[in-house]
């Protein structure tokens, strides 16, 4: 759409600093993106920061696009959305079934926004994709209206795996900003760590794949079987 991304640095705990976001805004800024709980970091924005994101969007008349696909997977504290604190329609929320219900391959998500913004999105959307498939829509309806206990079980399982990962990295002497949500971690790793893991059959992603700020880190996903995670940690 002709936009130019402008990366901003994260804090040491890998959360997004509202002050840094606001400082980066210019007259040409149309939108900034918030992702909490986050991929690739697992970071969760505290409520005070989320309130600030809403204020920034309101006062600067820019869109805050809040990616909340990992919403149910918060281990420490609660999930907060900037749309809850906005005084205007400057916050747009995207979400989906991929993470909530392990429906990644079904490709079904949604946008929550004001009527005027949805109408503008539809002008583009209708020429890109006619609609989500009928089976995906029926499956999503069943997931959204059915018992949610399975989501709670997933969150509890992810938290146990996170704790396992943190304990093992502590034993290794590797620094890991504590992920408070999603199912990712980004430890600080020595040079050659990623290649060494891959050579030994453990898939990790170099932090640089997510931008210059990821240098010196590796992204790990613990959305895997616990025993497989133990084996991977043994290799590391």
Q: What role is predicted for each listed range?
A:
Residues 1-236:
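PLP-dependent class I/II
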């Amino acid at each position: 759409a002709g936009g130019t991304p402008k990366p901003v640095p994260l804090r040491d705990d890998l959360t997004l600093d509202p002050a840094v976001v606001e400082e980066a805004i210019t007259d040409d800024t149309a939108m900034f993106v918030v992702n909490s709980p986050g991929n690739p970091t697992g970071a969760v924005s505290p409520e005070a920061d989320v309130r600030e994101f809403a204020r920034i969007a309101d006062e600067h008349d820019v869109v805050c696009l809040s990616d909340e696909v990992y919403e149910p997977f918060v281990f420490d504290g609660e999930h907060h959305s900037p749309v809850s604190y906005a005084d205007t329609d400057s916050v747009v929320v995207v979400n989906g079934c991929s993470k909530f219900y392990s429906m990644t391959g079904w490709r079904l998500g949604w946008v929550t926004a004001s009527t005027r913004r949805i109408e503008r999105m539809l002008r583009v959307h209708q020429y890109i994709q006619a609609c989500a498939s009928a089976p995906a829509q029926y499956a999503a309806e069943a997931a959204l209206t059915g018992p949610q206990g399975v989501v709670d079980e997933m969150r509890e399982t992810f938290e146990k795996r996170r704790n396992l990962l943190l304990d093992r990295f502590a034993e290794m002497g590797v620094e890991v900003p504590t992920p408070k949500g999603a199912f990712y971690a980004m430890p600080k790793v020595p040079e050659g760590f990623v290649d060494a893991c891959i050579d030994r059959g453990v898939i990790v992603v170099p932090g640089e794949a997510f931008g210059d700020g990821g240098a010196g880190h590796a992204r790990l996903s613990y959305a895997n079987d616990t025993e497989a995670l133990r084996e991977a940690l043994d290799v590391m």
